[in-house]
Amino acid sequence: MTGVNPATGKNPAPGNGPAAEGGPDQTPSPAKDTGPDEDTASDEDTASAQGLDARLVVDRGDFHLDVTLSVAPGDVVALLGPNGAGKTTALRSLAGLTPLSRGGRLRLDGVALDRTPPESRPVGVVFQDYLLFPHLTALDNVAFGPRCQGVPKAEARAQAADWLDRMGLADHAGAKPRRLSGGQAQRVALARALAIRPRLLLLDEPLAALDARTRLDVRAGLRRHLAEFEAVAVLVTHDPLDAMVLADRLVVVEHGRVVQEGSPSDIARHPRTDYIAQLVGLNLYRGTAEGHTVRLDTGPAITTTEELSGPVFVAFPPGAVTLYRDRPTGSSARNLWRCEVAGLETHGDQIRVDLTGELPLAADLTTVAAAELGLHTGAPVWATVKATQTHAYPA
């Protein structure tokens, strides 16, 4: 069960389970016994089907979502993608706030939840803005879920106190949300979601509302709590660092479909779309390999150290690019292209140079190097990359 949207301002009352946080404005209502779906798994199937097995199909106007997820208990999966890719729609369909369309399915620990209302699902949700009840203390916010499950008030408050203690918030149990910092509010929201002992934990951009310093501390704590969580966790984010640090596996969604999935290291090492390449900071190209030479689909050839054949991707980091104002002589780099500066911007402690020309690419230079080269928009340059700094892999 999840927590309800506090926008109604109504006092919580015991019941069978709350609606999902961020869902329709409603007070908890008793869960209906909808019975199993016709295709509910047998006991034997259920015993061997622990975790999440879902195909999330949602048709909404011109947008079509079709995402398949399979997650084992104890694993954390991050849904990563640009704005409008369908990440939040997928999360809401898992919570039951957005109904699945024809062809969709949702099983949790072998039990079909397709037709189960949100308040009856064993799901905890933490949304981006947390949605804590403003009129309740931190303690009562966390106790709300257990109370709606029928736990006696004293026991529910004791459980809530234990969760707040685990979150390092024991001293803030009596504080109302307006007295909490962003990081404290995030931890209260997480405690509220975990207090109902969910079999599926959903987190929608859980760190997005925090400043950089607070995010650093809260991210470390969230990683610890997720490592201790024994059920399934699904995290939605557009921040690659959050995804890399918090998740065991990444599922990248673009235009409503999965374009790549794998471990964080595999995704970072082998991006397969421009979005992912930009996310992990790589120049990415597609072409056809003939030995150590890759002839790009659009552009020149690139020399690599890998010996491959057929369709491939080639990637290299912006830091692997060396720029010259004049054509270099005596360089050991096997790749040389004539380019033009399209733009410059500060990128951390370096200057990111966007280049057009024979090969569009990004290059990272120190501020001193950029000044010595006298770079400006429209300046002609030569770009070189050593073959040893490229990475080619099958498409």
Residue ranges and their predicted role:
Residues 78, 114-117, 122-131, 143, ...:
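ABC nucleotide-binding domain signature
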